A protein has these predicted regions:
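N-terminal export leaders
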Residues: 1-3
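Terminal presequence/propeptide segments associated with secretion/organelle targeting
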Residues: 7-176
């Protein structure tokens, strides 16, 4: 009965996000440390960022130093369907290995880790200064593409994207 009541208390409690939404390069370190007595620093945030993974647009996390990744079912069900056969339905029956050699690879899926964030707001905003309409859009698109190309420097191992925040109030180049 005690476990049931404890569980009910967890369900009934409210989650508060007093610090709001934040990105890895804009986390309110001092505010959180002061309020909660934590000792978060940039090195800790970098480790958390390096554990965060993006798979085909889904969020995921490394859960081992061996590269094991945990994500949501809907993010990998397509892979399970592709790997299934009439004899082995991985969606219905699941799959577990005894060792790494027996693991299955999801064809066409790539795990991306965010390795760098650069604020490019000034550069993006300057590219459209004094322009309107199609000319404005073309200039912004050209500048965004140039930033992405420069950041990845032609290295096919990386995926660089300029991300817009706050309805165009801030831009960051994310390198995965």
């Amino acid at each position: 009965m005690g476990a049931l009541l404890a569980g009910a208390g967890l369900v009934a409690s409210r989650a508060l996000a007093d610090e709001g939404m934040w990105t890895f390069d804009n986390f309110p370190i001092q505010t959180v440390n002061d309020k909660y007595g934590t000792r978060i620093d940039q090195a800790w945030l970098d480790r958390v960022r390096n554990a965060a993974v993006r798979i085909q647009g889904c969020s995921a996390s490394f859960v081992s130093d061996q590269g094991l990744i945990l994500t949501n079912w809907h993010c990998v069900v397509g892979c399970a369907q592709e790997l299934s056969s009439p004899e082995q339905d991985y969606v219905k029956n699941g799959f577990m290995t005894a060792n790494r050699e027996e693991e299955k690879r999801c064809p066409g899926q790539t795990a991306e880790v965010l390795v760098d964030i650069v604020d490019v707001t000034d550069r993006v905003l300057a590219s459209g200064a004094g322009l309107e309409g199609a000319a404005f859009n073309a200039a912004r698109t050209a500048e965004t593409n140039a930033i992405q190309t420069e950041a990845c420097a032609g290295d096919p191992k990386f995926n660089c994207q300029v991300i817009s925040f706050y309805r165009g109030g801030r831009y960051a180049m994310y390198k995965f």
